[in-house]
Amino acid sequence: MIWLTWPRALTPPRRLPGLALCLAGFLSTAGEETSERLAKRECSKCHAFPPPASMHRVDWEKGAFPYLEDLLGIAQIENYDAQTQAAVRARWDTIKAFYLRQSDEKPSTPSATEPPVSAAFGHRSTVEKLNVTAIHHDAANGLVYVGDELSQAVLVYDRAFRNVRTFAADKVPCDFQLAEDRLYVCSHGSLDPLDSEAGEVGYITDSGLGEYRPLLRGLNRPTRYVPFRHSGTDYAVLCEYGISKGKISLYREGESVLVLPMSGAIDCRVLDTDADGQPEVYVLVAQEHECLLRFTMRPGGGIAQSVLIKKQPGWGFTAMEMLDADGDGAVDVLLSNGDTTEFRSNPRAYHGIRIYDLGSDDLAEKQFIPAHGVMDFTVLDAEADGDLDIASVSYFADFRHKPHQAAMLHIRHDGRFANQPLPGHEQGRWCRIASGDIDGDGDPDLLLGALNYQTYSRAYERDASFLRSVQIPRAVIARWERLGNHLRVLENRAKRSR
């Protein structure tokens, strides 16, 4: 087995027990240096440098800094001598002062007027008492597969949404991937954000109609398993998200032959985009890395690595898709970012969905669709006009000022996207979305999965006034709790609305 070295554009995460050790390099730095240079040097040791403008001043002060001090173990500095303590505190205070000085005040945020709800979709049915963690639509057999955290099982529904099959997993199914005649299922031991070896990859035979069989066990929060063939040999890519100990693995004929140790691998695609007969593996990575990686298979078994996109740690990548989004015959990369799990903060203007031109060397951004807190999206032709549209759900939406962004339809007209709330956007805290011809009438419908998984105040979240200013309104949470988590089915009515 080969353990890959880190791509040059990435830096390995530091596995250090406390802030004093993490900042120990400060003591060996000769002379004084500017606060900006100090911040760039030290913050870039673990991840890409986050510019001060990436968050408002109050978010740095009340959100990011308490979180980082807890993460780095600032309390442990008391175990060191007075000189070390003074030096480390002075440098840390200098870094914080730089960010507070260079970041902007939070402007007032008036509540936005909600745009008209999309007439292209209407509520068809609801499947109650489901903590939805994954959705897969089997178009050939008219079945919908749902990963349910509540029952820790894969539930299968027919077109009338009758539960026709249940695969007990005793784990939380989080991803489905159909490859040839197998429906692969990635499962976690729980939704708790902890490193664990309770994860599993298995598959359901006969394209999801047969029996469940485990394939790989003892995994650290697996998020995607993609099998493929190359030069007559069976390969597979496994993404283990983990928390601090995740990894990306390549299997050949069932044996692990290559490992890249990095946490946060969240999605994967295998394509031959340049039609040279050599497959390329694209992996989206979140956590502190926030990047898009490409592994190119070479004749003779070699693998070339490259970093196509690298963002700062507050970016929050959540999902990806690769297809020809604008009909120009070339594959585009669609990426969403909106995860703010680590600490609560105000909306970030760079959250949303971006379309990148894969044909350019620098992966140029072609379009940006703003959507705060976006967690998942699906691409579909909602109006049957030949233009590919996008539907998205935002788990971390701005529920105080723009609650309609929780579930949106982004309609493409003349190359631009117009945003419309989906019917029932306020009915749940949507975590997953999928599209497909659910009712068999020839046009794509939508499936929305709710998962109200509340995060309560953590030890480092101590400023009650700040927390009140960014928390989800109690009335919104009360509505979610009253309705319960569920699967919502939206029927395509675009033909009727014309």
Regions found by a protein language model. Give the residues of each.
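Residue-level detector of bioactive/disordered segments in secreted/extracellular proteins
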Residues: 5-8, 24, 272
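Small-residue packing motifs within transmembrane alpha-helices
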Residues: 20-21, 60
